C-alpha cells in the first residue's frame, strides 16, 4: 500500500473520531502569516472565513527556490472542514482540518490537492497550524507543500 494513501487514510479516521466529540464554533475571520518548511523556505500569508466548521481560505506564497526548482508567486485556494474535538485544556484546543485546494502553478504539487492540517487554538484568538497540501499520489509531481501558520482569529463582524 502507498505510504501517502495510508497516511491520508489514517488522518481521515482521526478526523472522523474527533468529529464525534466536536464543538461547533462561531463564524470567524482569520489573518495569518507563516513560512513553508521541508521542501522550501518561503513566506506565506492567508485570509480565511469559517462558518459552522467549514473554512474558505486564500493563501499567497512568495516566489523563490523549492526542492523542485524556482517557483513564481503562488496563490492557493482551499475549502476545509475543521474539527475541534474538545480535548483541550485551559483554552488550548487542538483541531484537525481536511479539505481540498487549488493552486496557480506550484513546482511541488499538481493544481488540485487535498489540504490536511493539525493545529492548536489558543483561547479562540490565535491558532498555530501545520499545513500540508498533497495530491496523495494522483499527480506525478507530488512533493507536497508544507508550511506552519500563525493566525489571528476574530469573530466575523456581521
Task: Label the predicted regions.
Residues 49-99:
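Detector for outer-membrane/organellar transmembrane beta-barrel domains
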Residues 24-35, 94-98:
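Transmembrane beta-strand segments of Gram-negative outer membrane beta-barrel proteins
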Residues 1-28, 158:
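Cleavable N-terminal export/targeting peptides
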Amino acid at each position: 500500500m502507498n505510504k501517502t494513501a495510508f497516511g491520508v487514510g489514517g488522518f481521515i479516521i482521526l478526523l472522523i473520531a474527533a468529529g464525534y466529540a466536536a464543538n461547533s464554533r462561531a463564524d470567524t475571520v482569520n489573518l495569518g502569516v507563516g513560512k513553508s518548511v521541508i521542501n522550501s523556505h518561503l513566506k506565506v500569508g492567508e485570509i480565511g472565513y469559517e462558518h459552522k466548521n467549514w473554512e474558505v481560505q486564500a493563501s499567497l506564497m512568495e516566489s523563490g527556490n523549492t526542492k523542485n526548482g524556482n517557483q513564481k508567486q503562488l496563490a492557493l485556494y482551499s475549502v476545509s472542514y475543521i474539527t475541534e474535538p474538545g480535548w483541550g485544556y485551559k483554552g488550548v484546543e487542538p483541531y484537525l482540518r481536511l479539505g481540498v485546494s487549488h493552486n496557480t502553478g506550484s513546482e511541488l504539487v499538481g493544481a488540485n490537492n487535498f489540504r490536511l492540517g493539525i493545529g492548536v487554538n489558543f483561547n479562540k484568538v490565535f491558532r498555530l497550524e501545520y499545513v500540508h497540501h498533497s495530491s496523495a499520489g494522483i499527480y506525478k509531481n507530488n512533493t507536497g507543500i508544507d508550511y506552519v501558520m500563525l493566525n489571528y482569529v476574530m469573530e466575523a463582524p456581521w
